[in-house]
Amino acid sequence: MSTPDNHGKKAPQFAAFKPLTTVQNANDCCCDGACSSTPTLSENVSGTRYSWKVSGMDCAACARKVENAVRQLAGVNQVQVLFATEKLVVDADNDIRAQVESALQKAGYSLRDEQAAEEPQASRLKENLPLITLIVMMAISWGLEQFNHPFGQLAFIATTLVGLYPIARQALRLIKSGSYFAIETLMSVAAIGALFIGATAEAAMVLLLFLIGERLEGWAASRARQGVSALMALKPETATRLRKGEREEVAINSLRPGDVIEVAAGGRLPADGKLLSPFASFDESALTGESIPVERATGDKVPAGATSVDRLVTLEVLSEPGASAIDRILKLIEEAEERRAPIERFIDRFSRIYTPAIMAVALLVTLVPPLLFAASWQEWIYKGLTLLLIGCPCALVISTPAAITSGLAAAARRGALIKGGAALEQLGRVTQVAFDKTGTLTVGKPRVTAIHPATGISESELLTLAAAVEQGATHPLAQAIVREAQVAELAIPTAESQRALVGSGIEAQVNGERVLICAAGKHPADAFTGLINELESAGQTVVLVVRNDDVLGVIALQDTLRADAATAISELNALGVKGVILTGDNPRAAAAIAGELGLEFKAGLLPEDKVKAVTELNQHAPLAMVGDGINDAPAMKAAAIGIAMGSGTDVALETADAALTHNHLRGLVQMIELARATHANIRQNITIALGLKGIFLVTTLLGMTGLWLAVLADTGATVLVTANALRLLRRR
């Protein structure tokens, strides 16, 4: 890694290895700072929001060091560094851009504008020059040591000073910016101390191992960001817009809803769009994990980033700049970094006292034996310096976020978006799942199966009235009724004063008369009681069409189970997770679905009833609520974790803690398995980190290990923890 100096140039910098997440405490983790960012303005409730793009962060400890430096500035209300998307966000009452840039420059970091082009990457030779230089100098020093001890000692001192200079400089910068216990500080003290007592070879070896750890750290950071980088690369930089019969190449930021664009075969959509071409196949695997191309017809929505498989297509832009499907996913990733798991917060608090405590122990080990027992100063100074290096909490600090980030990335690859470590941790504890029925267990596209009008009205008239009231509604049943009327080519009149009745139905004025569409049982319908019972017993949903309090007839609709619903329920049972259906549908229709899946159910529930049921179930064991509609949002909020189907409403997706973008219920099983695997991984990582520290603490006091083994142990623990966390990315 390299750290920018005050003039924006890169200087060699050595930092121990760390992985792929938002680490808790910059002061505590092995990293150095090469960060640069971008200032963009937006209004915020707490003042003005400024944002920069941050480049060069090789571990999440860099993010915490940047936060530390900015947080000390007067006038800063809030500061966040989002490691996955390399973004610095500062909320302030006044324009503090100059102060932020100055503070970070003094701390050894540089900033660039968020909209600026990516900085060109340094050549591999330049990037690895510090490591190569130190290896060559180390080899020369060993050679000289074999033939001439004095010259060998001088060579080791020179090697140490060359490696130490950038580290000590960065340590001073970080101390000035408030990061007192950064690994750069520990390394500087240990190397200088080793030189002081004549352990020149070990001082040089410590720095060499440190630099190797830094290169591993850079590799881990790039692996951590691969998913986000791939997602950002899904959007092309330009689009072909059709205007007045002419084609023009425009930047995607200039596209607006209503624009008509053209995408060639093999091209990616620059924005969410509505298909205007007759039909086409789209590869949406990068967004949803769905490997099979999806067939779309005229009027269907297609997300940004999807690829037109086999033909030139025309679409109408639906999304504003920065509000496409890809942008929403990136926003979820940013939000996920803000929602840290409880165990992450615990490790953060623990690490804040761990390093100072180890430094205090090292000082006592250095002073007490020589002062009280006349022991050798050189021996105990050496042991104290070794303990100082053991005090680096890199492996411990990254043990949790490395696993959580890998878990979140693995879930995203499979089309499951989990909003942060807290949600992932909660998901791993779930032993119950409550399902909404329509749109969750079923495909959410019911069809009209029967129309039964009262005497004196035709089927067409009944369907026309119902479609007029339901036009524009988002509920799957409403859309099915409108779709049926459109297929029949009926002239649908315009309804006025349309009003949704919570838990009951929807009403409107049609041709000056009040028409109500409601569930059977919400309005007296004695003449149709037998028919309603018969239809509901067959698993169909029945709605009444009421005009001026007179029941004009009933419309029956039926949805179909998702293809993988039965398999998903069976696999959940195998995991020890119990399922239950909570639905606003009638009991008979719910019973038909529940019987087919072998689930318990509660039917006829209003939104507040669902909340009550979820609260009661949640008191017995952690419960996940899976839904897709506005009426599911309160229940999802009340559950231990809310999970939205990707086809759900914006309200459901916003409320949920996780979402299945591909609408496959088996993805829920994979999410729970992955969450549990992540928990196990975290426990393993903490054991590795603390176990190795404990072992080397004892062996150091017994005189069995020295400085270079202490650094090797720290780097080794960090490598093991990171490698263990990366195993989650390979889970099937």
Curated annotation (Swiss-Prot):
Induction: Induced by zinc.
Keyword Nucleotide-binding: yes
Pfam assignment, any one: E1-E2_ATPase
Organism expressing this protein natively: Escherichia coli (strain K12)
Ranges in the topological domain labelled Cytoplasmic: 1-124, 168-179, 223-356, 405-685, 730-732
Cellular component, GO, one term: plasma membrane
Binding positions for Zn(2+) 1 per the UniProt entry: D58, C59, C62
Molecular function via GO: ATP binding; ATP hydrolysis activity; cadmium ion transmembrane transporter activity; lead ion transmembrane transporter activity; metal ion binding; P-type cadmium transporter activity; P-type zinc transporter activity
Membrane topology, as annotated: Multi-pass membrane protein
Top-level taxonomic group: Bacteria
Domain notes: Has two high-affinity metal-binding sites, one in the N-terminal region and another in the transmembrane region. Both sites are able to access and bind metal ion independently of each other. The N-terminal metal-binding site is not strictly necessary for activity and metal selectivity, but is needed for maximal activity and may be involved in regulation. The metal-binding site in the transmembrane region is essential for activity of the pump.
Subcellular location: Cell inner membrane
CDD domains registered for this protein in UniProt: HMA (cd00371), P-type_ATPase_Pb_Zn_Cd2-like (cd07546)
Function: Confers resistance to zinc, cadmium and lead. Couples the hydrolysis of ATP with the export of zinc, cadmium or lead, with highest activity when the metals are present as metal-thiolate complexes. Can also bind nickel, copper, cobalt and mercury.
GO biological process terms on file: cadmium ion transmembrane transport; detoxification of zinc ion; intracellular zinc ion homeostasis; lead ion transport; metal ion transport; response to cadmium ion; response to lead ion; response to zinc ion
Gene name in the database record: zntA
Catalytic reaction(s) noted: Pb(2+)(in) + ATP + H2O = Pb(2+)(out) + ADP + phosphate + H(+); Zn(2+)(in) + ATP + H2O = Zn(2+)(out) + ADP + phosphate + H(+); Cd(2+)(in) + ATP + H2O = Cd(2+)(out) + ADP + phosphate + H(+)
Catalytic residue positions: D436 (4-aspartylphosphate intermediate)
Record key words, sorted: ATP-binding, Cadmium, Cell inner membrane, Cell membrane, Ion transport, Lead, Magnesium, Membrane, Metal-binding, Nucleotide-binding, Phosphoprotein, Translocase, Transmembrane, Transmembrane helix, Transport, Zinc, Zinc transport
Phenotype when the gene is knocked out: Mutant exhibits hypersensitivity to zinc, cadmium, lead and, to a lesser extent, cobalt and nickel.
SUPFAM superfamilies named among the record's database cross-references: Calcium ATPase, transduction domain A, Calcium ATPase, transmembrane domain M, HAD-like, HMA, heavy metal-associated domain
Gene3D superfamilies recorded: 3.30.70.100, Calcium-transporting ATPase, cytoplasmic domain N, Calcium-transporting ATPase, cytoplasmic transduction domain A, Calcium-transporting ATPase, transmembrane domain, HAD superfamily/HAD-like
Protein name as it appears in the record: Zinc/cadmium/lead-transporting P-type ATPase
